[in-house]
A protein has these predicted regions:
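GST superfamily/GST-like fold recognition
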Residues: 1-22, 104, 127-194
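N-terminal polybasic phosphate/anion-binding patch
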Residues: 1-70, 84, 138, 142-145, ...
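Short, solvent-exposed cationic patches
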Residues: 17, 107-114
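Amphipathic, non-transmembrane alpha-helical scaffold segments
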Residues: 51-52, 98, 176-179
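Generic enzyme active-site microenvironment
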Residues: 73
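Active-site-adjacent loop/tail segments of enzyme domains
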Residues: 76-106, 132-134
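Short beta-strand-to-turn element immediately C-terminal to the catalytic PLP-Schiff-base lysine
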Residues: 79, 113-116, 170
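Anionic-ligand binding region
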Residues: 111-115, 119-122, 127
Length: 194
């Protein structure tokens, strides 16, 4: 399979790609996501549009420097009734987010973009629907105490392939999408463009 640059520092995305036989080099794109999100929200962009735009901006930024390579950018956001929920900045923020999601259904949206020479050549967005159990504050605090800082910031508050699975009464959708990378569609694209 083709070598690709992953424009992300996400260890989980790297592991998903490698586990699926995709040879990658990691080169995180240092874009200021908060500024981009604020600008898009000001223009009334949906969480899905924000996710798509961030994935594309990340991929394009690196592909402008590495013009002969395919560059994969990715982004995941939570959509709670149209409200964009971003990654927590610290554990207190994570607890606030979990309390907001507590007992409710939300969408986890993951977008991927492949760029070459500064231009998007392919993109895909997938959604999963997650329904969180109605948990006590103490149960949420116990969950947060069990996970590492790295997991906390990398998984949109919950680590679905680990302890986070226990937070949910219902999970609909691809687990790889929830972990931030709809790998089946990426593989389909790469296999059809060898």
């Amino acid at each position: 399979m083709v070598d690709i640059i992953l424009a992300s520092k996400s260890k989980v995305r790297k592991e998903i790609l490698e586990r699926n036989g995709i040879s990658i080099t990691v080169e995180p794109s240092s874009v200021d996501e908060d500024i981009i999100k604020k600008a898009l929200l000001k223009n009334k962009a949906t969480p899905e549009i924000i996710s798509k735009n961030l994935a594309e901006i990340k991929a394009n930024k690196i592909s402008l420097k590495k013009t002969n390579n395919l560059v994969l950018g990715a982004d995941s956001v939570i959509d709670l009734n149209g409200e964009l929920i971003s990654k927590p900045k610290n554990r207190d923020d994570a607890l606030k987010i979990l309390k907001k999601l507590n007992g409710k259904k939300h969408y986890l949206i993951s977008s991927v973009c492949i760029s070459k020479g500064g231009f998007m050549i392919w993109n895909y967005t997938d959604k999963a629907i997650l329904t969180m159990k109605d948990l006590t504050d103490k149960e949420l605090e116990i969950y947060l105490a069990k996970i590492t800082d790295e997991a906390l910031y990398a998984y949109n508050v919950y680590q679905i392939e680990g302890e986070g699975r226990n937070l949910f009464s219902k999970i609909e959708g691809d687990e790889n999408t929830i972990m931030g990378l709809p790998i089946k569609k990426i593989k389909e694209y790469l296999n059809s463009h060898k």
